[in-house]
Amino acid sequence: MTNIRKTHPLMKIVNSAFIDLPAPSNISSWWNFGSLLGICLILQILTGLFLAMHYTADTTTAFSSVTHICRDVNYGWIIRYMHANGASMFFICLFMHVGRGLYYGSYTYTETWNIGVILLFATMATAFMGYVLPWGQMSFWGATVITNLLSAIPYIGTSLVEWIWGGFSVDKATLTRFFAFHFIFPFIIAALAMVHLLFLHETGSNNPTGISSDADKIPFHPYYTIKDILGALLLILALMILVLFSPDLLGDPDNYTPANPLNTPPHIKPEWYFLFAYAILRSIPNKLGGVLALVLSILILVLMPLLHTSKQRSMMFRPISQCLFWILVADLLTLTWIGGQPVEHPYIIIGQLASIMYFLLILVLMPMASTIENNLLKW
């Protein structure tokens, strides 16, 4: 008799995706982040659901309701901090996942890659809207500053901002709609993630060498299921250390002050995972130019398949490209640091140089290095 997992309409989909899936035998721990992102998403949906049961999306009670969750709801504090720090873990996994894709040339699977970029944008939008919900000082002013950027769009900008706000400033209407969007977006992300997997399973996974692994495949279960479980345990360990020992390490103290439209905080800054893009935005003196640079800093990922000039897929055997890749990582860390600093000398010039380096590395230096490497190999 044929196994039910191979005949049942639902089970055979699960089977072909997670059990009998032929996977390359040499994929390293860098391939764990896909499953970790799935776990992060499930964790965020579950903790978010329980938070939504006690949260009120109204300017007069939002801040108090978050305080109530932390003080009066059974284990509310741990749910709240798991959700807040879960977002940080989500972005750590996202950056690692994208970095892996860049290093090993996974972007040559263009459909999978482009859905991934859309997923990144959707996750960033969700995180931004979630940050507004506690209605602290940084929530309010962050929402004001970031939504105001849309006013840089010629002709329709101002109308667009007022339409998003639902009035003439960030107020009750804004908070209510942000809560509605923040609730629905993770489910859209989950649907997109399934499409992401669907496209991936059309081609199969890449591997560290970037060479076809058709000749050497192993079943996903038990080899990679056990490996993913190990990754998940390490992720949960890291998250719980953060939640239980220093839950406010990555947060902003200003968010423990209720939102006050009459009092601007001295340094308005987003959560740490947006600081690199925020630094690029601030490094351009022109408003529209800054907004374009901000969007392009992420949208540039779409161009990666077009900028691939090497005759090898992976960077595994390309030392010059490897060197530039790690310079890019260092540059992004520099931008992250600058994004959290006040707008004054020497931070302004460092931010501008790091922003120029970011675009220069991706658009010019890395494609040039690939061409040089091709010639060195006499291809």
UniProtKB/Swiss-Prot annotation:
Cofactor: heme b
Cofactor binding: number and manner: Binds 2 heme b groups non-covalently.
Annotated heme b b562 binding sites: 83, 182
Job of this protein: Component of the ubiquinol-cytochrome c reductase complex (complex III or cytochrome b-c1 complex) that is part of the mitochondrial respiratory chain. The b-c1 complex mediates electron transfer from ubiquinol to cytochrome c. Contributes to the generation of a proton gradient across the mitochondrial membrane that is then used for ATP synthesis.
Family per record: Belongs to the cytochrome b family.
Name of the protein described by the UniProt record: Cytochrome b
Primary gene name: MT-CYB
One cellular-component annotation, GO: respiratory chain complex III
Subunit structure, interactors included: The cytochrome bc1 complex contains 11 subunits: 3 respiratory subunits (MT-CYB, CYC1 and UQCRFS1), 2 core proteins (UQCRC1 and UQCRC2) and 6 low-molecular weight proteins (UQCRH/QCR6, UQCRB/QCR7, UQCRQ/QCR8, UQCR10/QCR9, UQCR11/QCR10 and a cleavage product of UQCRFS1). This cytochrome bc1 complex then forms a dimer.
Domain of life: Eukaryota
SUPFAM superfamilies: a domain/subunit of cytochrome bc1 complex (Ubiquinol-cytochrome c reductase), Transmembrane di-heme cytochromes
Membrane-spanning ranges: 33-53, 77-98, 113-133, 178-198, 226-246, 288-308, 320-340, 347-367
Compartments, as annotated in UniProt: Mitochondrion inner membrane
A molecular function (GO) term: metal ion binding
Keywords: Electron transport, Heme, Iron, Membrane, Metal-binding, Mitochondrion, Mitochondrion inner membrane, Respiratory chain, Transmembrane, Transmembrane helix, Transport, Ubiquinone
Membrane topology recorded in Swiss-Prot or TrEMBL: Multi-pass membrane protein
Binding positions for a ubiquinone per the UniProt entry: 201
Annotated organism of origin: Cephalophus jentinki
Source taxonomy: Eukaryota, Metazoa, Chordata, Craniata, Vertebrata
Pfam families documented for this protein: Cytochrom_B_C, Cytochrome_B
